[in-house]
Amino acid sequence: MVKKHSKKYLAAAEKIDHSKKYSLADAATLVKDISFTNFDSNVEVVFDLNVDTTKADQQLRGAIVLPNGSGNPKTVVVFADGEKAKDATQAGADFVGTDDLIQKVQSGWTDFDVAIATPDQMAKVGRVGRALGPKGLMPNPKEGTVTMDVTKAVSDAKGGQVTYRTDKNGNVAVPVGKVSFDSDKLAENIKSVSSTILGARPSTVKGTYVLSAHLASTMGPGVELDVSSL
């Protein structure tokens, strides 16, 4: 079934030259110009990668601290005790604890955006994996959320860290800011993300790695990027 788009979407799409690929600077400006929502939309960059996600070594996953932040305040939970709990609190974590937080999650509470845990707490956190996993909240070493350095982890999460991972089709979608951001700040964030994705190329990938890349705001049409400008 063909998806029907709104008049606003179609009007925005008409402003895009679909026969060309846009430079990073031009795409950042255009996405801001054609955004039509009545709220401060998120902006996302999507990479279509030539990877085989059935192979473990071609599954990308990690975290990036955007130089200009994401524009989305994060509620951060830290599973830690003792001195590490104190460090997390001082770093600005919203909720810090161990068994008490586990019990809250078991009762259905997942009203937070990022969960961080010290390695010694992961056995306990694993008990609520079914609640955290499907929501993308399970602490993970690749994303820097299973760590003894909770101060840095909380600081990164609060300071604009975003996570990424390939989906089953080899696509990676990463939020890079808001349409209210200056276009140069959006471009800086996108450049940071693209550098990370390009640097994470699996050694077993042959031929072209990035098949295409698009930039879009919430509910808006995608603007194809000139990969060479990244």
From Swiss-Prot:
Signal sequence segment: none
Native source organism of the sequence: Oenococcus oeni (strain ATCC BAA-331 / PSU-1)
Protein's name in the database: Large ribosomal subunit protein uL1
Xref: HAMAP family: Ribosomal_uL1_B
tRNA-binding keyword on record: yes
InterPro entries (UniProt xref): Ribosom_uL1_bac-type (IPR005878), Ribosomal_uL1 (IPR002143), Ribosomal_uL1-like (IPR023674), Ribosomal_uL1/biogenesis (IPR028364), Ribosomal_uL1_3-a/b-sand (IPR016095), Ribosomal_uL1_CS (IPR023673)
GO BP field: regulation of translation; translation
Gene3D superfamilies hit by this protein: 3.30.190.20, 3.40.50.790
Subunit structure: Part of the 50S ribosomal subunit.
Gene: rplA
Family the entry assigns: Belongs to the universal ribosomal protein uL1 family.
Keywords: Repressor, Ribonucleoprotein, Ribosomal protein, RNA-binding, rRNA-binding, Translation regulation, tRNA-binding
